[in-house]
């Protein structure tokens, strides 16, 4: 009993056990969610093309992702003769682990977060910046021209659009007055358009998507480019680079790359939900809307954002590389910089800047 009352147990070991348990729970839930999000992506693409999509494994094809998992795990990983074996195998692990690490600070409900740090937005921004290393390592270590060219493209593409995402974060910071993700959501609950017009229960009007709609569009398109999703999948352009930086990969390493890609996509959807769509807040703070648990609202908004990602893949043709760069540097960069200046000016001169 003395051990369980000691400072070592109460101050270090027990909080550590709780944090590990929370991390494992988030990891399991996230991996299961990714399995069905991948299935939804394939189903949406199939529906646009007027076909059924996966519908054989399990009822309505619900077990298709798990069958694919089994297929990849049971395959033999083949390493090219000229590849750097250590870096070649480390690259998919780096890509996957960095994508999963971002979920340590993402709140899915009030108090539902592993680590509620005050610089959560900067943490995720830093993690997304580091994810390029996995792709560069894969492209260089494969000792092949297609992966190397894809890695160079990816580096330029991600750097170009991270600048715009950074300005988006600054505008949200100006409006919310904090970099804490939970506090950003709460700021959309207590102040905004609904409060100004005297209808505080109509919380949907407080969401930053309305006053910052141009920045929402910039964030959405930049997130597509950041995660190498169509129409900005120049890194994996099948008609040019076969499979891009993943040309030489198969089996479990390829699975880890795909897992990291979809986790990054869901992370961007969650960030859009928190920054612009009010996180776990209901659209109307009245019954029966506020009877629904916050986690349900959060998931619905994340799925809505993913639907937008999937529809972009299904209906928008791929950009040329020069068009991609021009959009990032000549359109989004000036627009986002101008919006930062406008938002700061309006908040200052209207006297509504957060204290």
From Swiss-Prot:
Coiled coil: none annotated. InterPro entries: NADH_UbQ_OxRdtase_su1/FPO (IPR001694), NADH_UbQ_OxRdtase_su1_CS (IPR018086). One of its GO terms (molecular function) is oxidoreductase activity, acting on NAD(P)H, quinone or similar compound as acceptor. Pfam families: NADHdh. It comes from the Bacteria. It is found in: Cell inner membrane. It is a multi-pass membrane protein. It catalyses: a quinone + NADH + 5 H(+)(in) = a quinol + NAD(+) + 4 H(+)(out). It is an enzyme of class 7 (translocase). One of its GO terms (cellular component) is plasma membrane. Keywords: Cell inner membrane, Cell membrane, Membrane, NAD, Quinone, Translocase, Transmembrane, Transmembrane helix, Ubiquinone. NDH-1 shuttles electrons from NADH, via FMN and iron-sulfur (Fe-S) centers, to quinones in the respiratory chain. The immediate electron acceptor for the enzyme in this species is believed to be ubiquinone. Couples the redox reaction to proton translocation (for every two electrons transferred, four hydrogen ions are translocated across the cytoplasmic membrane), and thus conserves the redox energy in a proton gradient. This subunit may bind ubiquinone. NDH-1 is composed of 14 different subunits. Subunits NuoA, H, J, K, L, M, N constitute the membrane sector of the complex. Belongs to the complex I subunit 1 family. This is NADH-quinone oxidoreductase subunit H.
């Amino acid at each position: 009993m003395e051990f369980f009352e000691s400072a070592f147990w109460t101050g270090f070991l027990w909080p550590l056990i709780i944090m590990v348990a929370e991390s494992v729970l988030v990891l399991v839930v996230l991996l299961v969610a990714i399995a069905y999000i991948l299935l939804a992506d394939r189903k949406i693409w199939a529906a646009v093309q007027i076909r059924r999509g996966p519908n054989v494994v399990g009822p309505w094809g619900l077990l298709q992702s798990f069958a694919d998992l089994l297929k990849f795990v049971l395959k033999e990983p083949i390493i090219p003769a000229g590849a750097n074996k250590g870096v070649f195998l480390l690259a998919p692990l780096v890509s996957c682990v960095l994508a999963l690490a971002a979920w340590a600070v993402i709140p899915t409900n009030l108090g539902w977060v592993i680590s509620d740090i005050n610089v959560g937005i900067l943490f995720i921004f830093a993690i997304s910046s580091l994810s390029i290393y996995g792709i560069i390592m894969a492209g260089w270590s494969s000792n092949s021209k297609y992966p190397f060219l894809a890695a160079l493209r990816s580096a330029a593409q991600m750097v170009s659009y991270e600048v715009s995402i950074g300005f988006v974060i600054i505008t949200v910071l100006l409006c919310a007055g904090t970099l804490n993700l939970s506090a950003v959501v709460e700021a959309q609950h207590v102040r905004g358009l609904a409060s100004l017009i005297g209808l505080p229960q109509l919380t949907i009007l407080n969401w930053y998507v309305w006053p910052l709609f141009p920045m929402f569009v910039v964030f959405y398109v930049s997130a597509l480019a950041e995660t190498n999703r169509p129409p900005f999948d120049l890194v994996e352009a099948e008609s040019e680079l076969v499979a891009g930086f993943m040309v030489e990969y198969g089996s479990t390493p390829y699975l880890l790359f795909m897992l990291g890609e979809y986790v990054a996509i869901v992370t961007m959807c969650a960030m859009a939900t928190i920054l612009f769509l009010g996180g776990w807040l209901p659209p109307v703070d009245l019954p029966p809307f506020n009877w629904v648990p916050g986690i349900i609202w959060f998931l619905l908004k994340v799925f809505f954002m993913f639907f937008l990602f999937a529809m972009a893949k299904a209906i928008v043709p791929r950009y040329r590389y020069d068009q991609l760069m021009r959009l990032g540097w000549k359109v989004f960069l000036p627009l986002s910089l101008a919006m930062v200046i406008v938002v700061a000016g309006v908040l200052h001169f209207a006297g509504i800047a957060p204290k």
